[in-house]
């Protein structure tokens, strides 16, 4: 049972990291004065979760964004499902002079954490922390598509890759 709980936490952290990264990719979509303005609306996509034992699972995700503070903050709701897990993540992200910070929660398992990072024109590098779990994150944005890579540390999850498209779903 402990292994199953640890595996769920790894998936939940990966999902949370993914949720945060969807939000953090906004600076490449819009000017620095309103980095999250282009996020408003719905996004959807699919990808893969790779496990340390060499197996993998497909994952599908849908996200919705409510942007505020003139494009400097947003609230996000993300729902993802693979063959083994479903999770529902909420995040609140702010931008302050190019530095990104925020919080996330996964309601079904009462998990919470923080995010921090930096952005350039088309690439985001960030870190998500939640208790005993952490993950490194990279996002590349091109138009209305986002490519996301997540590498959790200390879990059964080796990595997560997802492509999202705005306005579908």
Predicted feature locations:
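N-terminal secretory signal peptides that target proteins for export/translocation
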Residues: 1-9
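Generic N-terminal leader/processing signal
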Residues: 4-5, 28, 164
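Localized chelating/binding microdomains
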Residues: 9, 18, 35
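Bacterial N-terminal signal peptides
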Residues: 12-25
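Sec/Tat signal peptide C-region and signal peptidase I cleavage site
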Residues: 25-31
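Central antiparallel beta-sheet cores of small beta-barrel/beta-sandwich binding domains
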Residues: 32-142, 149-169
């Amino acid at each position: 049972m402990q292994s199953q709980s640890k595996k769920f936490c790894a998936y939940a952290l990966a999902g949370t990291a993914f949720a945060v990264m969807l939000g953090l990719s906004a600076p490449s979509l819009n000017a620095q004065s309103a980095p999250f303005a282009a996020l408003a609306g719905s996004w959807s996509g699919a990808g893969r979760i790779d496990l340390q034992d060499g197996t993998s699972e497909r994952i599908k995700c849908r996200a919705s964004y409510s942007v505020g503070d003139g494009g400097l903050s947003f609230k996000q709701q993300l729902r993802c499902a693979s063959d083994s897990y479903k999770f529902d993540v909420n995040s609140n992200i702010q931008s302050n002079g190019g530095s990104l910070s925020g919080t996330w929660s996964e309601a079904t398992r009462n998990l919470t954490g923080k995010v921090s990072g930096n952005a350039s024109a088309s690439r985001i590098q960030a870190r998500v922390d939640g208790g005993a779990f952490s993950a490194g994150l990279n996002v590349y944005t091109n138009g209305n598509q986002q490519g996301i890579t997540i590498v959790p540390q200390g879990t059964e999850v080796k990595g997560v890759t997802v492509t999202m498209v705005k306005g579908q779903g």
